[in-house]
């Protein structure tokens, strides 16, 4: 089979959990945008250009209330600052992807990062091709689902209670899968423990960045200690 076709096939199979998650959350976003007075085209454009998931839901409130550009920018920075940590993991891969590098940085999300981490055993070139197609497919899922939700929201009333839990379910599934595939569980236990403490200290709206900083510091220190031994 053609290497690019094989990479696309592999990326599609790996992206199925993301598809299931993005389908419901993207539609929810489109419906909420429609309820706020924005048509399906606005949902499609925002998802294609902004593509930040959780922040897009916050953006609905900002757009409806006429928030300042500064407020929107600062909120976006804090809500998406964790992506800079994700990108560090794949810097060597992105550097080898030429003109696609900037798109890969733009399209790196929580979900694509988690799935990319499962591709580490592939040969470098195959891994990079698979990562690229995974990014494109995931971007398409989110954008298409947002537009579809905007269209359906115009004609069908929806009860959105509990729809956001599908994202939690996705991450629990990925966590369990990674736990079963690896023999060293210290990173997972460190991240889980720090996240629980940070949640208790900083609250649901402010725990993500501190948890990432502390977990990263622990893993860097542990890696240096292991290397010295």
Model-derived segments and spans:
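Juxtamembrane membrane-interface segments at transmembrane alpha-helix termini
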Residues: 56-62, 85-90, 176-181, 199-208, ...
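Membrane-embedded alpha-helical modules
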Residues: 128-210, 221
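Alpha-helical transmembrane segments and their membrane-interface exit regions
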Residues: 51-54, 78-85, 170-176, 195-197, ...
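Short, Lys/Arg-rich, polar N-terminal cytosolic tail immediately upstream
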Residues: 1-10
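Pore-lining transmembrane helices
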Residues: 10-105, 118-119, 141, 187, ...
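Helix-loop-helix junctions within the multi-pass membrane cores of secondary transporters/permeases
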Residues: 3, 73-164
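Transmembrane helix-loop junctions in multipass membrane proteins, especially transporters and channels
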Residues: 30, 34, 38, 92-96, ...
């Amino acid at each position: 089979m053609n290497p690019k076709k094989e990479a696309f096939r592999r990326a599609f199979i790996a992206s199925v959990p993301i598809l299931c998650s993005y389908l419901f959350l993207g539609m929810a976003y489109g419906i909420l945008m429609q309820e706020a007075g924005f048509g399906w085209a606005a949902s499609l454009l925002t998802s294609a250009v902004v593509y930040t998931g959780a922040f897009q839901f916050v953006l609905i409130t900002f757009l409806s209330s006429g928030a300042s550009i500064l407020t929107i920018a600062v909120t976006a920075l804090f809500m998406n600052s964790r992506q800079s940590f994700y990108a560090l993991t794949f810097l060597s891969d992105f550097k080898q992807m030429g003109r696609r590098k900037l798109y890969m940085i733009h399209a790196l999300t929580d979900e694509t990062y988690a799935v990319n981490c499962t591709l580490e055993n592939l040969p470098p070139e195959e891994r990079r091709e698979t990562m690229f197609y995974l990014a494109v497919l995931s971007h398409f899922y989110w954008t298409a689902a947002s537009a579809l939700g905007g269209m359906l929201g115009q004609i069908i009333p929806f009860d959105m209670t509990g729809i956001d839990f599908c994202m939690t379910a996705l991450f629990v599934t990925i966590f369990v899968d990674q736990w079963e595939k690896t023999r060293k569980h210290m990173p997972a236990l460190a991240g889980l423990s720090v996240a629980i403490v940070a949640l208790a200290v900083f609250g649901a709206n402010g725990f993500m960045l501190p948890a990432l900083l502390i977990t990263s510091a622990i893993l860097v220190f542990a890696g240096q200690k292991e290397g010295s031994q």
